[in-house]
């Protein structure tokens, strides 16, 4: 069993994968999208297939008061479009063994702050954060989901 964490950004989509035991999240790269979220869905579908992903966790960027702003609505639409594409892929698949991965949203408030802090603590120079902060944010999102699952 493998889970995929997704942090949607305007320029990059950060990815993280879990270990098969669903204990640890690790960075899995960025998708450079420049606002083209359909391209991001195509790339995520490739990762899902290549890594045999069972569950996709998408960060939901709520505002500090818990309400949904423009970015959260965009994340919800993106997750819904991913689910539609997964359903279509399932219907087009000849395999009866194809399992559609579950797609969930998780509150990602302050994950970027946490990601920057983790990179700083790892002695990564702050001018080198930009290329990796999205995937580190995806790690924080996914690790939060994994920890919550273990606590239940």
From Swiss-Prot:
Organism: Bifidobacterium longum (strain NCC 2705)
This protein's record includes keyword Nuclease: yes
Source taxon at top rank: Bacteria
Protein name: Putative pre-16S rRNA nuclease
Any GO BP: rRNA 5'-end processing
Claim: Repeat is one of the keywords in the record: no
UniProt GO molecular function: nuclease activity
Family: Belongs to the YqgF nuclease family.
Matches recorded under NCBIfam families: RNAse_H_YqgF
Record EC number: 3.1.-.-
Keyword terms, alphabetized: Cytoplasm, Hydrolase, Nuclease, Ribosome biogenesis
Cross-referenced HAMAP family: Nuclease_YqgF (MF_00651)
InterPro entries xref list: RNaseH-like_sf, YqgF, YqgF/RNaseH-like_dom, YqgF/RNaseH-like_dom_sf
Subcellular location(s) of the protein: Cytoplasm
